[in-house]
A protein has these predicted regions:
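Feature marks extracellular polysaccharide-active and adherence modules
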Residues: 57-59, 78-80, 87-90, 97-99, ...
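Intrinsically disordered, low-complexity terminal regions
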Residues: 1-65, 135, 159, 164-257
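Extracellular/lumenal glycan-associated surfaces
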Residues: 72-80, 92-93, 111, 130-131, ...
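Active-site-adjacent structural elements in folded domains
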Residues: 119
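Beta-strand repeat architectures
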Residues: 44-53, 64-73, 84-92, 103-109, ...
């Protein structure tokens, strides 16, 4: 008989490349003279040593920093990041004191990311879980192709926010640009300010008491919008008229939504 596991061995619930860290162990990295690759290697090395709180000084807008972290971690960037920062993560809590470029936290699975200032386009592209928060404004195509999780924007959001989103929720406390929710399959977008225009198959829906309760709780946890009136929010959902699947594609339909 073929044996696929040994019941006497300890179970391992970690990814390969994920580490057990102690949040009370703290260290700092000065990134001023480091390439993005060397900095990521240092972060990984410190996690292997069990450090659970890592502060990165002088990130200087470098690209692809803090990517691929698959375990719990307190990660603080004192400054701004470039493109594709904090991508493909599953678990860490990240705080960035500056701003971020395009595609921050793309393909995020779990955790919490907080941006103190503004974010570029494609913020939270294809995220699947966790909370992604920007206290400032975000660029175009925020939440494009998102499949879960929550994106919270303290300022305004650019054009085509929520484009082709399939699940999850987006909260925008400010205004939204043109074509909000264009071609969305599912999910919900909440807008506190003005909507320049709705995209294809995006429609307004009735805000329920359950929605308002959830918004209050989420904003409180996110430490943003403490005086925001959730009762004035506009709720946007998919009209589902683009669900044009024929009888030969039941599996494709199930996989898409």
């Amino acid at each position: 008989q073929q044996v696929f596991f040994n019941p006497e061995e300890a179970e391992n619930f970690f990814y390969y490349g994920a580490y057990d860290v102690d949040f009370n162990k703290r260290t700092e990295i000065d990134a001023k003279d480091l390439t993005c690759n060397k900095l990521n290697e240092k972060i990984n090395s410190f996690m292997q040593e069990g450090y659970g709180t890592i502060v990165v000084k002088n990130p200087q807008g470098k690209h692809s920093l803090g990517v691929g972290i698959l375990n719990k971690l307190n990660l603080i960037f004192e400054g701004s990041l470039g493109y594709f920062g904090i991508g493909c993560i599953d678990g860490p809590v990240v705080r960035i004191t500056g701003r971020v470029g395009w595609s921050c936290a793309e393909n995020m699975m779990a955790g919490k990311v907080l941006i103190e200032k503004n974010a570029g386009s494609c913020f939270g592209a294809a995220i699947r879980g966790g909370d992604l928060i920007c206290k400032g404004s975000v660029g175009a195509r925020t939440g494009i192709d998102m499949k879960g999780g929550t994106i919270i924007v303290g300022g305004d959001a650019g054009a085509f926010t929520g484009f082709m989103m399939q699940r999850g929720r987006i909260i925008i406390l400010g205004d939204a640009g043109i074509n909000l929710g264009d071609s969305m399959y599912d999910g919900t977008i909440f807008v506190g300010g003005k909507i320049k225009s709705l995209g294809s198959d995006a429609i307004q829906s009735k805000l329920t008491p359950q929605d308002m309760d959830w918004l209050r709780r989420k904003l409180k946890v996110a430490e943003i919008g403490s005086d925001f009136d959730v009762s004035k929010v506009t709720k946007v959902v998919a009209g589902k008229k683009l669900w044009n699947y024929d009888q030969l594609e039941p599996t494709e339909k199930k996989g898409a939504i």
